[in-house]
């Protein structure tokens, strides 16, 4: 088992890395959403052909396939980053509680 200080350092570094990754995923998701919205607005201004709203909606969706794919990829990355961040936060909490327990145990033993 790792010494407590090493556990704290490792957990803190892991949490910092997870926070950086999460911030990047949030930014990438927002950018993918903006790209989709801009592309959709552009196509709507240009006009989408079709007999009715349903057909025009389907054609619009087909035209925006790449943008939707980018958004779904960004959503998946964001979900993963959130999970990794939560795990890192739990590991950090566990390391802190272990140190606190060790401190309490050491105080009682004296």
Which ranges hold each PLM region?
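Short, charge-rich amphipathic alpha-helices with coiled-coil/heptad character
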Residues: 1-20
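Extended, low-aromatic, Leu/Ala- and acidic/polar-enriched alpha-helical coiled-coil segments
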Residues: 12, 61, 65-76
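Extended alpha-helical coiled-coil "stalk/arm" regions
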Residues: 25-61
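Short acidic DE-rich linear segments
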Residues: 105-110
């Amino acid at each position: 088992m790792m010494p407590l200080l090493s556990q704290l350092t490792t957990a803190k570094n892991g949490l910092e890395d997870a926070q950086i990754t999460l911030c990047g995923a949030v930014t990438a998701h927002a950018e993918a959403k903006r790209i989709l919205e801009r592309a959709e607005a552009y196509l709507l201004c240009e006009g989408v052909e079709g007999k009715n709203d349903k057909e025009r909606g389907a054609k619009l969706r087909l035209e925006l396939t790449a943008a939707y794919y980018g958004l779904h990829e960004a959503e998946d990355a964001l979900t993963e980053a959130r999970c990794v961040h939560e795990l890192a936060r739990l590991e950090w909490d566990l390391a802190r509680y272990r140190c606190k327990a060790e401190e309490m145990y050491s105080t009682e033993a004296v």
